[in-house]
Structures are given as structure tokens and as C-alpha cells.
Amino acid sequence: MAQEQAIDLDKLVSDKIEKRVAEVGLCLENKGLGDDEISRLAEMGILTEVTNLDLGENKISDQGLSVLCKSPFIKNLKVLNLKSNNITEAGARSIAQADNLSNLEQLILKFNRIGEQGAVYLAQSETLVKVTTLDLFRNRIGEIGAKAIKTSKVFRGVSRLRLD
């Protein structure tokens, strides 16, 4: 049985951070990151520079997402991509209640499992007011979740919306 190789998160972050004029992107898509790595990432001060964080196609669950959402270093995030992870309604609730995500403009959660209640949590958020792009494709949000998103006062400014 092969041992799973430990991820050198510091090296991965330094290799993958991309600085452009007025924005800094960190693409950690499909790197096998789980909750332990996301918890360590949440403690990295370099995140204060990051405006675009791509964590798609990893093994992040609600637990890791909760830690990330509480990080004081994510206040400058404008784009958060969490597609294809293991996020449920509890993770959606963490995002909805995260004061540190008040500058978020794009939230990509496609191919997760937030369900109806997760969509309702997002729709009732008091901090996601700057979101203009919201992608909840393949999250089983159903009619109740879709209605909550479409009628949400928080998401009035959304110009790009993708639901089930």
C-alpha cells in the first residue's frame, strides 16, 4: 500500500501565487487539498494579498471551509472558486455568515451539495452584498433554493447567475 505523500503547502502557495496589476491570484485547483491543508492555508498571512482564490476540485469539506471563512486574511478576496469539493449546507452557512467575505464579487460553488437549505442560507446572508456572479450549478438546491436566491435582496446586484 503506497503512502500518501504530504503536501508542501508553503511551496505550493509560493509556486502558484500570480501577481497582476490590481489583483493577485492563487490557483490551487486540483491539488488534493483537504481540510488540514485548508486550515493551514487560512493561517497564512500572504492571503491578505490574494484577491482571486481558486480551490476547485479538491477534498475540502464544511470543516475546512469553516476555518477558511474565519480567517482574518481573506478580507480582500473578490473571487472564491470552490467548485467540485465536499461542501454541504453547513459550508454554505459558513460562507453566508463570514464577515471576512464582504468584498466577494464572484462565488463559484458548482458541483457541491449545498441543497435547498444551503441556498437559503446564502440568500439570507448580510455580507455577500457585492456578489455579481453566483454559480450554484449541480447543488440540488431545488425550487425552494432557487426561489430564495432569485428573490434575495442580497443578490439584487447579481448579473451572472447559474442554478441547477
Model-derived features: positions:
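The feature captures the LRR N-terminal capping module
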Residues: 1-39, 43, 155-164
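Short, solvent-exposed loop/turn at the beta-strand->alpha-helix junction
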Residues: 5-11, 31-39, 59-66, 86-93, ...
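Inter-repeat linker/turn residues at the boundaries of leucine-rich repeats
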Residues: 21, 45-48, 72-75, 99-102, ...
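Conserved hydrophobic beta-strand positions in leucine-rich repeat
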Residues: 24-28, 51-55, 77-82, 104-109, ...
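Compact recognition or signaling/catalytic modules
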Residues: 26, 31, 99-107, 113-117, ...
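Ankyrin-repeat helical core positions
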Residues: 42-43, 69, 96, 123
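Alpha-helical adaptor scaffolds
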Residues: 54-103, 108
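Leucine-rich solenoid repeat scaffolds
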Residues: 128-164
